[in-house]
Regions:
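Sequence-level preference for short, compositionally simple segments enriched
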Residues: 1-182
């Protein structure tokens, strides 16, 4: 089978190739969203792994999705003519990162931190419901800030604020991390 230079023969894909693709045209992101409902913690943590390409390479993104076990969703971003494979289910994110971690070079620190966050959530899960303590929640937010600092686009320019759900005091994560060190 003759391929166009940017096409990939699916039989030649490997974990190393996909990890290189993630390093170059992917992202490992942790975002914090304010919860509209009144839950115990005012923010929801979203963990995400993306693979992005120009829309003319949609087939490659679909091949990667299939190689990774059909996880995530392929989405089209019309305004920039992009397609992306978005993986945000925690279990799928964890499985993909564990599978690719030995081969990730540039985003290795983000991957390790995200796996640490996922481990904290898994340990705190009881009957499919998260039972994260307040201290674990603050630690997770600090790890999210580390990922944000490592990602060049966010650059950690905006510090996350941690709200104490009991007293509603605002404390910047830098202050919290200094207390945890000392």
């Amino acid at each position: 089978m003759k391929t166009i230079p940017w096409e990939v023969d699916a039989s030649k894909l490997s974990n190393a190739y996909i990890a290189g693709f993630l390093d170059g045209d992917g992202s490992i992101m942790a975002t914090v969203e304010k919860r509209p409902d009144r839950r115990r913690f005012p923010y929801r943590i979203r963990l995400r792994v993306n693979f992005t390409q120009h829309e003319r390479h949609r087939k490659l993104i679909e091949i990667i999705q299939k190689f990774l076990g059909g996880v995530g969703a392929v989405r089209r971003e019309k305004s920039h003519q992009l397609v992306e494979l978005v993986i945000q289910d925690r279990y799928s994110v964890e499985q993909v990162l564990k599978r690719l971690l030995p081969y990730i070079v540039l985003k290795e620190r983000q991957a390790k931190i995200m796996l640490e966050i996922l481990e904290m959530y898994r340990k705190a899960t009881v009957n499919t419901r998260s039972s994260v303590t307040e201290k674990e929640y603050v630690n997770i937010l600090m790890l999210v800030q580390k990922i944000r600092n490592l990602n060049s686009r966010t650059g950690g320019k905006v510090n996350l604020e941690v709200f104490n759900p009991v007293t509603t005091l605002r404390k910047k994560t830098k202050e919290l991390s200094q207390r945890n060190k000392g």
